[in-house]
Amino acid sequence: MLVWLFGWLGQYYAPFSAVSSLTLRALLAVITALAFSMIFGSRVIRRLRALKYGQAIRNDGPQSHLVKTGTPTMGGVLILSAIGVSTLLWARLNNPYVWILLIVMIIFGAVGWADDWLKIKYKNPKGLIARKKYFWLSMGALFVGISLYYIATLQPNVVTTREMQDLLLPIFKDWMIPFSAVPFGIGFIIFTYFVINGASNAVNLTDGLDGLAILPVVLVAAGLGAMAYVSGDVRFADYLHVPYIAYNSEVIIVCGAMIGAGLGFLWFNAHPAQVFMGDVGALSLGAMLGTIAVMTRQEIAFAIMGGLFVAEALSVMLQVGSYKLRKKRVFRMAPLHHHFEEIGWKETQVVARFWIIAIILVILGLMTLKLR
């Protein structure tokens, strides 16, 4: 929004034209979202307390977590508001990828909000009925897949259907999985569905300790932002052998907003947490990361960078599967972070060590760009 205003003002005073710079706008998006979170964070927490929107803690979880009962939840509303305001201010709003990401944020955020609200209303950590929850999450993921496919169909001068669909394989320069060989984009749409829903639920499962999920979200958003920058610049895309998709240039503004909003939220979510993001934050942030990975065609690199989220999700799948088949547990408790608590790690140790792993994984994911 402001990029057009400053562009017009630049006709009369040249320094205003600098705001059209993508890098500067990305930095301004970070600063705006961070400032928004810091300014309104305490007010949001007070309001959540006044509304008695306290977290319901599972009795079968770690006993040390029972002291967190009543800590305000649904703090993801603060994160999403900061992302929305910052993106609307600094992104070029004629870019369809920006709007797809904002719609994803709203859809998954609304599902998460309903889940959180039901947990609070009925004092039950189960929340929204699984069938209804996954129906709406599925609708959101299918919306992304269909939208991206038809953008490629209608505007082949921006991105071809082949570039949009085929899955890049890291390290191998010309190797791809040809989803474009499946008619009508069905292969691509189904794959997109699993990427986005998988990312959304994986981040949600990771959000179980103070600060654990939000910093890895920030780190992965930064990594994907770098990949969006490369993909949206014809010179870098050609040099690094990735598809050039012009719309990805503005995706970095959304990534910047996610970074700023996440860091601002971490200020209040660090141990001992004053607020939890809840499903409204975790489901939407995970879905946005998954969507950006699909937009940039870097799903495998995303799986590497978000390896912490992958490990948390796999730990739950293994635990449930093993218990159903063998009546035995693989871990003392799932998700994975609870297992380490059960073997004696303090909460702050688990969080700090998982953060270190997340940093390493993001660096490894970024290295795949050059290795191609």
UniProtKB/Swiss-Prot annotation:
Subcellular location: Cell inner membrane
Highest taxon above the source species: Bacteria
One of the GO biological process terms: cell division
Entries under InterPro entries matching the protein: Glycosyl_transferase_4, PNAcMuramoyl-5peptid_Trfase, PNAcMuramoyl-5peptid_Trfase_CS
Annotated Pfam families: Glycos_transf_4 (PF00953), MraY_sig1 (PF10555)
The entry's keywords: Cell cycle, Cell division, Cell inner membrane, Cell membrane, Cell shape, Cell wall biogenesis/degradation, Magnesium, Membrane, Metal-binding, Peptidoglycan synthesis, Transferase, Transmembrane, Transmembrane helix
Chief site of localization: membrane
Required cofactor(s): Mg(2+)
GO MF annotation terms: metal ion binding; phospho-N-acetylmuramoyl-pentapeptide-transferase activity; UDP-N-acetylmuramoyl-L-alanyl-D-glutamyl-meso-2,6-diaminopimelyl-D-alanyl-D-alanine:undecaprenyl-phosphate transferase activity
Described purpose of this protein according to its UniProt entry: Catalyzes the initial step of the lipid cycle reactions in the biosynthesis of the cell wall peptidoglycan: transfers peptidoglycan precursor phospho-MurNAc-pentapeptide from UDP-MurNAc-pentapeptide onto the lipid carrier undecaprenyl phosphate, yielding undecaprenyl-pyrophosphoryl-MurNAc-pentapeptide, known as lipid I.
Name of the protein in its database record: Phospho-N-acetylmuramoyl-pentapeptide-transferase
Organism: Psychrobacter arcticus (strain DSM 17307 / VKM B-2377 / 273-4)
Native organism taxonomy: Bacteria, Pseudomonadati, Pseudomonadota, Gammaproteobacteria, Moraxellales
